[in-house]
Amino acid sequence: VDTENLPKTWSEFREVCKQVTEAGKGKYYGMIEGGKQVNRLEIAIRALSCLAGSKSNDIGVISMVDGKNVLNSDAMIQAFDFYSGLVQDGSFHPDTVNLAAPEARALFAQNQAAFLIQGSWCISTWEKENPDLEFGVMEMPVPDDGAKGGLPYIGAQPWMGISKTSDNPELAAKYLQGLYSEEYQSGVVEDGGFVSAIKGVNEKYMKDGVMKDYYTLALEQGKLCPDPIVGNADASAVYANITEISPNLGQIVQGTLTGKTDYKDTLNTLAENTQKEWENGIKKAQEAGAEVSAEDFEFKNWNPLEDYTAEDYQNK
């Protein structure tokens, strides 16, 4: 792999993976992934489809375009075609579908693959456990005709709290204050494994060169997506009434990794059943008193090449 001229498009990436695999002769491959974890596979395929313009949003979030979900959109199928092409080329490590993410990370560190999709926590792990490993980070490759969106993420929702029945709420509060203090967060960032949510900490304390590259690329290619719950808090009542359809998106990717090529039909079935489940969830939420409709899950002013801002919610 020419590290000074990394593949930028799907075709270029596929060709490089093929070259690596052929040169490896069974010892190493172009790509490896933690294919046993279907949630990770869903994150990856959603990201790739968003680069193709699907507006599929972050994992666990339903977004609609023209009143329909995008699980079988042209962009989603393009993303599956890309993954399937890598599989048909033999470029995926043969153990991929049976590996958890830490196992894939370890095999990558043993030079059994040239590329994998994982998070920033790999950086400090490799530097500590595999000090001789030469590695770097790169942007996700985009469709040959250019990116039509960015890598999707949504703003963090509150996920830590103190129970009202806690015997020591003051102590719990002090713990949370300490956890998110600059003193503690600076150490986490300096260690090179994580990005802080506290304003200014990353810029001030991030020292690791690879981590800085990761942070820069994430800011450039990642795009904040609209969150229906931010637009209307009552949208949460819909999620509470939804039962996940099986096989889900990640499971369909998993099947593709084993060589299955009938994903178009499976995606059509997933999209159809998801639409029914979603419309039923909206109906149940409305019957329970929630002021919510299908329009709360569609954002016609969403440009997936840009961050979706508070002002965009107001002008939806």
Task: Give the ranges of each region predicted by the language model.
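Alpha-to-beta junction loops
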Residues: 26-28, 110-119, 131-133
